[in-house]
Amino acid sequence: MHIANKHFIVSGAASGLGAATAQMLVEAGAKVMLVDLNAQAVEAKARELGDNARFAVADISDEQAAQSAVDAAVSAFGSLHGLVNCAGIVGAEKVLGKQGPHGLASFTKVINVNLIGSFNLLRLAAAAMAEGAADESGERGVIINTASIAAYDGQIGQAAYAASKGAIASLTLP
């Protein structure tokens, strides 16, 4: 896919890999909707990237919030051609530590953001891309999910993170 003049959503775009991805896309001529839960940081990053960047504050694991972010991108740009899922959190906790077994709530939180959130945004963005016209190559869009080496080589004290990234890798490969 040629990036220039295409419209993307990047999740986790306020910092790190998401911010770098959004910057690369804007520099390549794309328009980008930066999505993040951190309102101040995502607004500042969008402002820094200029006129081809917009932002939406959203918890991507929430169906309505993710749909609002997709709708905002389509409303701002007229169509959607790509999604890059970079949103993710790390929970440092051993399965069995000195304080007892891994907390289920903390495990669930990481899975909700990293896996459920990524899938939620993926399915909603795919629906928006399917509504658009195919380009000269017959493409309607592209979806890129980011994982981690932890998907294949789990890390001590990061069971939830490794499990979520393994699931993202499995979800992406078919």
Task: Give the location of each predicted region.
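Active-site helix of classical SDR
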Residues: L122, S164
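Conserved glycine-rich Rossmann-like NAD(P)H-binding loop of the short-chain dehydrogenase/reductase
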Residues: A28-A44
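Active-site loop-to-helix junction immediately N-terminal to the catalytic Tyr of the SDR YXXXK motif
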Residues: G154-A162, L171-P174
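Conserved mid-core segment of classical short-chain dehydrogenase/reductases
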Residues: V90-T108, E131-S137, G157-A160
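Canonical Rossmann dinucleotide-binding motif of NAD(H)/NADP(H)-dependent dehydrogenases/reductases
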Residues: H2-M33
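The beta1-alpha1 cofactor-binding region of Rossmann-like NAD(H)/NADP(H)-dependent oxidoreductases
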Residues: A39-Q40, V57-A69, L104
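Residue(s) in the substrate-gating loop at a strand-loop-helix junction
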Residues: S148
